[in-house]
Amino acid sequence: FFLQHPDVFNKVIALSGVYDARFFVGDFGGDEAIYQNSPSDYIWNQNDGWFIDRYRQAEIVVCTGLGAWEQDGLPSFYKLKEAFDHKNIPAWFAEWGHDVAHDWEWWRKQMPYFLGQMYL
């Protein structure tokens, strides 16, 4: 939602996500609704200065673990990071350890940690 509406939010924390819609639907062709919800594609093609400026002013955290059940999301995590770097959008892409699983136990630790880093 943040990438579509950076005028509404100026902070975002994304935990353990899959950021490429192909993981869920395969090749989505020209389906605009799916494209709009595939962040790793959407950000690569976003060239509107209004959006880019707001992304650059926002606080963005994207975090993944490297443990159980996180492997499916890692390719899109790195693809999204590459897109942000290419667009010079500052964001904190955090990789937690190999013991960090795709699970509530870890999200309950990560969310307060990152909120504290954002001074919220």
Regions picked out by a protein language model, each given a short descriptive name:
Residues 1-120:
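Non-catalytic cap/lid and distal C-terminal segments of serine-dependent acyl enzymes
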